[in-house]
Curated annotation (Swiss-Prot):
GO CC annotation terms, alphabetical: cytoplasm
Protein's recorded name: Elongation factor P
Family: Belongs to the elongation factor P family.
Entries under InterPro entries matching the protein: Elong-fact-P_C, NA-bd_OB-fold, Rib_uL2_dom2, Transl_elong_fac_P/YeiP, Transl_elong_KOW-like, Transl_elong_P/YeiP_cen, Transl_elongation_fac_P, Translation_prot_SH3-like_sf
Organism lineage: Bacteria, Pseudomonadati, Pseudomonadota, Gammaproteobacteria, Alteromonadales
Location(s), subcellular: Cytoplasm
PANTHER family noted in UniProt: ELONGATION FACTOR P, ELONGATION FACTOR P (EF-P) FAMILY PROTEIN
């Protein structure tokens, strides 16, 4: 059992007797009330999606499924294909990846964990920190140096996030895949 705060994209939870893959989590806090965690879920058996909310301290039944370390191989619409050390290939539907799809690029060497339910690959969990190239960002604004200055940038894979003002196009940066936040320039 985990609290709703501890659930991450890629986890599989049991609700009403069905396994659901967590595609996205969003936490909102208000001044007087407890935190609310919104989850976007996909039913493993029925291929339906839903959004639901829980209080931050609600207990959820996270089931432990078989996981296998794999690397990304190629995209065969609508499936992402991953390969293990023994060259076995596993297809994962694009919609099961959720926000993780933005970090999957050709030639990536990051080891991902593919999750299986009844011998079917159902989700992929990326490493917490990935390194990607900045494919586009505006030049730094001169004179704007007070505080923590951020600007938008596009990374390999097409995702957009805020980066520090000193980052330039072509730089390699570290990104936290859980929060889509810039960590540092490499």
């Amino acid at each position: 059992m985990k609290t709703a705060h501890e659930v991450r994209p890629g986890n599989v939870i049991m609700l009403d007797g069905n396994p659901w893959v967590v595609l996205k989590t969003e936490t909102s806090r208000s001044g007087r009330n407890a935190a609310v965690v919104k989850l976007k879920l996909k039913n493993v058996l029925l291929d339906s999606t839903t959004e639901t909310s829980f209080k931050g301290e609600d207990k959820l039944d996270v089931i432990v499924l078989d996981r296998l370390d794999c690397t990304y191989s190629y995209f065969a619409d609508p499936m992402y294909v991953f390969m293990d050390e023994e060259f076995n290939q596993y297809d994962v539907e694009a919609e099961n990846l959720g926000d993780a799809a933005a970090y999957i690029t050709d030639g990536m060497e990051d080891v991902c964990q593919v999750t299986f339910y009844e011998e079917k690959a159902i989700s992929v969990e990326l490493p917490i920190i990935v390194t990607r190239e900045v494919t586009y960002t505006e030049p730094s604004a001169r004179g704007d140096t007070s505080g923590k200055v951020m600007k938008p940038a596009t990374i390999a894979g097409g995702s957009t996030l805020s980066v520090a003002d000193f980052v330039k196009t072509g730089d390699m940066i570290e990104i936290d895949t859980r929060t889509n936040e810039f960590k540092k320039r490499v």
